[in-house]
Amino acid sequence: MANLHQQQIIDKIQNITFKDGTFLNEVISDIIIKGNNIGFSIDISGKNKLEAEEIRLKAINELNNIKDVNNITIVFTQKKTIDKKAQKPKHFVENVKKIILVASGKGGVGKSTISALIAQQLSLENYQVGIVDADIYGPSIPHIFGINEIPKTVEGRIIPILAQNIQIISIGFFVKAHSAIIYRGPMASKIIYQLLSNTRWNNLDYLIIDMPPGTGDIHLSMLENYHLDGVIVVTTPQKISEIDVIRSIDLYRKLGLPILGIIENMIYMLESDRCGHLSKKYNIPLIAKIPIIPQIANACDKSLPLTNLLTLPLEKYL
C-alpha cells in the first residue's frame, strides 16, 4: 500500500454523480490514507440523505477494487444552514408564470440573439412571451427588434413595447443611442428591479431575461430576490468561453437555480467538442449547437424574425 495516493481514490469515484448533476469528486474533502485504510468526508449540504447513503455505498464498492484496501471510512458533513425565517422573501413578478434567464460567462457569444430567438419561437408556439433586456451595460434587444420608441407609463407602471407579438422592456429604451451606460452595482440592481417589477406585464407564460455577461451583482441580486424557473447558458467553442461558463455553472448551482441546458453558438469558428464535454461532466443537457450563419447578423440588423433561419428543441427543456 505504500504506492496508494489520493489520485487513485479520486479516479475510482470520478463517474459517481448525484441526481442534481453534482459529481462526488466535487464534494469530498479530508482524504486520509493510513496503511491499508482510507477515508474521506462528503459534504451533503442540500442533498437527500437517502441518496447520499446510496452514493456512499457506490463509492465503497468502487474503492474496494483498489488492491489491498482493508477499511474504507466515509463520513457525511453538512454546512450550517441559514435560518429560513431570517431569509429575505423572494419576489414573484405579477402576471408572469415562468421566468427563464439566458446567461453567459463572457460577452460576445450571441446571448441576446439567442434570447430573441427563444422568445420568437415561443411566441410562434402560441405562448404569451416577454423579454427583459437586463444587459444594462450593452443592451442589444432594442436593435434586434427594431424598437426606437420610449415606453409609456400608466399610473406609474411602465407599459412594455410590443414587437413581433412579444412584450419587451430594456434600459436601452431610456438612454440615447451610442451613449455610455455607467452604473455601480447597487444602482444597476435597482434598475433591474424597476424593469421587472414596475412593468405592467400582460399575462405572460414566459418572461425571458437577457442577462449581462459574467457573475456579478446583477446575477446575485436576481437569484436572491426573485422566484426563477431556470437558466439557459450560452457559450462558444473557445477555451476562454469554457472557463467563464464553468464559473456561471458554479454560481447557479451554488444558489440552487436549475440549469435547463447549454447552447453552443458559432460552432464552426473552432472545431471542438467543448460543450459536449461540459454537458457530460456537469450532467447538463446540450440543447443545440448553432453554426455560424451569416444571415443571422443580417436578420438582427434588419429586425427580421430569427425563426426563419433556425429553431431550437425548446419543448424538451422549458
Swiss-Prot record:
It comes from the Bacteria. Gene3D superfamilies: P-loop containing nucleotide triphosphate hydrolases (3.40.50.300). GO terms for molecular function: 4 iron, 4 sulfur cluster binding; ATP binding; ATP hydrolysis activity; ATP-dependent FeS chaperone activity; metal ion binding. Keywords: ATP-binding, Hydrolase, Iron, Iron-sulfur, Metal-binding, Nucleotide-binding. ATP binds at residues 105-112. InterPro entries: Mrp-like_CS, Mrp/NBP35_ATP-bd, NUBPL-like, P-loop_NTPase, YlxH/NBP35. GO terms for biological process: iron-sulfur cluster assembly. Homodimer. Belongs to the Mrp/NBP35 ATP-binding proteins family. Binds and transfers iron-sulfur (Fe-S) clusters to target apoproteins. Can hydrolyze ATP. This is Iron-sulfur cluster carrier protein.
